[in-house]
Amino acid sequence: MIRFEDVSVTYDGAAEPTVRGVDFTVPEGELVLLVGPSGVGKSTVLGAVSGLVPHFTGGTLRGRVTVAGRDTRTHKPRELADVVGTVGQDPLSHFVTDTVEDELAYGMESLGIAPDVMRRRVEETLDLLGLAELRDRPISTLSGGQQQRVAIGSVLTPHPKVLVLDEPTSALDPAAAEEVLAVLQRLVHDLGTTVLMAEHRLERVVQYADRVALLPAPGAPLTLGTPPEVMAASPVYPPVVDLGRLAGWSPLPLTVRDARRRAGALRERLAATETPTPTATATATAAPAPSPSRPRRPRLLRKRAPVPSAALPVAAVEALAVRRGRVEALRRVDLTASPGEIIALMGRNGAGKSTLLGALVGLVPPAGGSVRVGGAVPHRTAPRDLVRRVGLVPQEPRDLLYADTVAAECVAADGDAGAEPGTCRALVSELLPGVADGTHPRDLSEGQRLALALAVVLTARPPLLLLDEPTRGLDYAAKGRLVTLLRALAADGHAIVLATHDVELAAELAHRVVILAAGEVVADGPTAEVVVASPSFAPQVTKILAPQHWLTVTQVREALA
Ligand SMILES: Nc1ncnc2c1ncn2[C@@H]1O[C@H](COP(=O)(O)OP(=O)(O)OP(=O)(O)O)[C@@H](O)[C@H]1O
Ligand SMILES: Nc1ncnc2c1ncn2[C@@H]1O[C@H](COP(=O)(O)OP(=O)(O)OP(=O)(O)O)[C@@H](O)[C@H]1O
């Protein structure tokens, strides 16, 4: 159904092809997962299927790509639209209409599908993706994950023969990601749909793949195999594979269920070692002294009482209520963050995580209750003063970057922060060695842009650092570097609050997890205790080794050493 014959793509101005000699076939009714480190050309391969490469991106494509027999070089993307549905990395650039319902119908309208069929499919898709309550909402008012659901829904409604998906679950909460993948699998099994999907969070997707295509390094040949074959040698792999390799399991398990069946002996060995402490990973490097009054048990479904802390809190939120349009986005939220503490804010799409971060930087005013950051009330504090107290790296780092070059961005950041000239540039060099002054932020990779936005925010050395979905689009290596950096910042006394759907990141990094549901705090406690209590938010290692309380492969490796 999809066929690559010796394909190379060279972007304009590039000395070398981005991908070369790509040669593989995806038969009808198969789900193939495309994996590899950041920047190896996964999006480029996907773009060659939908025709975006080279028609929209420019550059030269050599060799031949055919989809359902049509050559994508001689057929423009719109001439492929009846067979290929595409979801790109940035849902916002994808939308053509204003409201959820119109967007779901749009693709079908342009293909001339009968009105009664359209109506039925829109209803089905609204239910399938949990969008029914949002059907009349302007898309611009949706949360990041809600937008990603609409983007996926809008390509499903026309029932294309081929789906090309670039990180379709990156903004979805864990339960929604599972639901979307189950829907895709049903389309593949029941309708014979062919799916080619790139994804970094392999723990979410690898078990759904019929085969895995690996681009191991830039310019290296693509290899195709069964998931266990490819995972045995891949430079990117999920925690279940990491644990399997550590324990020497063969064949490698790819699912929690398979790994649990093998884990008996490992559990016994681990039982003889010291049981991990609730914040073992975090305490290994940079935890604040645990305050004796910090709650030891998650307070599921109970209102959290303010806890007096040894260190004066950097942020104190009390009984906060926030309205966004007609929506009560936050209700009765209490939260404190102390110096050196890393807090992961988790919860379903639309639960209010970004809104809470927005309230902490004064972007959204409270409708009730109070927010104090370093003693100031954020929405009443002048930006110049506020940047020295709190900084937010937004879900889309691009939203923070306005200048045409990295150097100009840094000069502006120094000015805004009242910092010594050169402060931001020094941070960029530390975080992003080798990036030239003249580079346009637009041409940076996702991970590089995140690092630049982080440097811009850190220029003012804010005691409170907020990050919204910081691991979107990052590969495991980049995530590892981010973890090291954030731990060092916490050790330096910064309080860090991150909104994330990445349960593996929370397990690795956070001292505390706060779960929001429908605008309210439903759990707040040490990471191990909160995630162990919740199947949705438990990392793979926890599920595999339960009832023991291990969170990460790093902990297990250290215990066995
Ligand atoms: N339109 C373009 N013009 C020039 N260079 C590009 C263009 N699109 C991508 N590139 C470059 O091609 C390389 C591969 O990018 P691509 O987005 O295909 O990688 P990827 O594997 O999808 O990465 P990620 O996992 O970070 O999304 C990168 O170095 C990128 O900078
Ligand atoms: N401008 C707006 N008008 C109306 N409702 C809004 C607006 N902005 C956000 N909302 C709603 O407020 C709720 C909270 O949104 P928020 O972005 O805080 O969620 P989130 O937990 O960060 O979600 P996600 O995980 O999807 O990023 C959602 O139901 C969202 O649709």
Swiss-Prot record:
ATP 2 binds at residues 347-354. This is Putative ABC transporter ATP-binding protein SAV_5847. The keyword Cytoplasm does not apply. Probably part of an ABC transporter complex. Responsible for energy coupling to the transport system. It is a peripheral membrane protein. Its main location: membrane. SMART domains: AAA. It is an enzyme of class 7 (translocase). Its EC number is 7.-.-.-. Residues 272-288 have a biased composition (Low complexity). CDD domains: ABC_cobalt_CbiO_domain1. It is found in: Cell membrane. ATP 1 binds at residues 36-43. InterPro entries: AAA+_ATPase, ABC_transporter-like_ATP-bd, ABC_transporter-like_CS, ABC_transpr_CbiO/EcfA_su, ECF_ABC_transporter_ATP-bd, P-loop_NTPase. Residues 268-299 are annotated as: Disordered. SUPFAM superfamilies: P-loop containing nucleoside triphosphate hydrolases. Belongs to the ABC transporter superfamily. Keywords: ATP-binding, Cell membrane, Membrane, Nucleotide-binding, Repeat, Translocase, Transport. Residues 2-243, 315-543 form the ABC transporter domain. One of its GO terms (cellular component) is ATP-binding cassette (ABC) transporter complex. PROSITE patterns: ABC_TRANSPORTER_1, ABC_TRANSPORTER_2. Pfam families: ABC_tran. GO terms for molecular function: ATP binding; ATP hydrolysis activity; ATPase-coupled transmembrane transporter activity.
